Amino acid sequence: FLIGADAAKHTISEGDMLVVPSLTLCGVTTETGCIYTEIIIKKENNNMNKIIKSGEVIKLKDLISYEDGSITNIDVVSNDTMKFVLMAFDDGTGLTPHRAPGNAIIFALEGKAVIGYEGKDYTISAGENFRFDKNGLHSVTADGRFKMGLLLVLE
């Protein structure tokens, strides 16, 4: 990625995240091509977690730790219309079936889990994604230790 008027180079790899301040010039150059997710936060009143630094390449999975027998989570960024959360599930832990308060996408960052969605089970592994519709009944159960990002669009 080339960031800013001076086109400072930032190399990113699979699973990396790069935060670019709004109204900052940026571009992408590759030798082999790439696929990336771009999230544009248009509201000024968003709450960015202070562990995230602009212009610094990070691995999302490294921002959260596992705790034995439980699920941990941290908000990365949120405002009244969206939320991006990281979650780490210890082996065998999970979220019981519940309805999504908005459209959502899961980003599997490490390990694998079983996603229950509207009566069907789906296995998701690191590098894969899964979408829920608003009010979709879903659950998440770790199959081994599992880390994920959750982008939730609130209306």
Sequence positions of predicted segments:
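Short, conserved beta-strand element in jelly-roll/cupin
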Residues: F1-L2, A88-D90, R99-V114
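Ligand-binding loop in jelly-roll beta-barrel domains
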Residues: S13, S22-N45, K134-E155
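Conserved short histidine dyad/triad with adjacent acidic residue
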Residues: S70, K83-A100
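A short, compositionally biased micro-patch
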Residues: P21, E31, N79, D90, ...
